[in-house]
Amino acid sequence: FLEGIVEKKTGKLRLSLSLSKKGKTARVNSLETPRLSQYIGKLNVILFSPEDLSLVKGSPAVRRRFIDMEFGQIDAVYLYELTRYRTILRDRNVYLKQLQTKQSTDRVYLEVLTEQLAKSGAKIILKRLEFLKELENYAKILHADITQQKENLTFKYKCTASIDDLEMNQGAIEIRLKETFETIVDKEIFQGTTLIGPHRDDVSFKVNGRNVQTYGSQGQQRTTALAVKLAEIDLMRAKTGEYPVLLLDDVLSELDGERQTHLLKAIQDKVQTFLTTPGLNDIARQLIKQPRLFRINAGKIEVRPETIDRKSTRL
């Protein structure tokens, strides 16, 4: 069980989340929310952990999850459409399996599901393109600052249905999705699964025109990941009018001194930050000028003095 009070411009909110064998229960001001999707966005949070450094070199699923998690916090329409898309996708995959195993031979229902999926998918793709363009604008500035103006960062949305030649509007994307589904329907029935759509799309990051995932050094990959994560902070503030809460989960030990400095510069005196670390060696002095220290020992949380013994590396 976790509970806290969030102070926003619109007032205070008491948020709680409990986990039991029956599932998760979320409450806002002691009132249970019927769906967890209605809870998301009440407190905007950005998590930065060592795993996020694999945002660039990880699998497409990692980058899709990043988009859905971060964008879903600030756009309720996107979150709703994403939930709807997943429901239709699940139904379509079930029916494709039935066609594959000859449990059904009627393709009319498949056409209905395909039309619904294309319409919902087009909305998601358009929203993602808009989100990534805004995020790119912030990330470019941060990335150029970190690299001392030597490198230029750009994003590229990689759609499984080619849309590069289209005008970016929902209708055009929807038509292209339908056309692509028509050309691969037999292959989808043979494999028993949906082969194209937002659930299979990807994002690539390019530095000076070269794919940093394929051709970038480890330093370039980490700089790109850092710029993208820091850009989230500015984008969330622009969209919501408030800074998010930042969670740094043992990530500073993974960054060199220069990247730590840029991280601190981006959050100093602006963002409420919770940082976890096994010791203090990897934390820059300027980050902990006025800290509140907590030590977790055997599952218990102890409040520590707000002064740090620099001779010791232990909390």
Residue ranges of model-derived segments:
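Structural recognition of the conserved hydrophobic beta-strand(s) that form the central parallel beta-sheet
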Residues: Q272-P278
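Conserved NTPase motor "head" modules and their coupling/switch loops across ABC/AAA+ ATPases, GTPases
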Residues: S104-V245, E254-E258, H262-K270, N281-I288, ...
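Conserved beta-strand scaffold positions in the cores of enzyme catalytic domains, especially
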Residues: V45-L47, T273, L293-R295
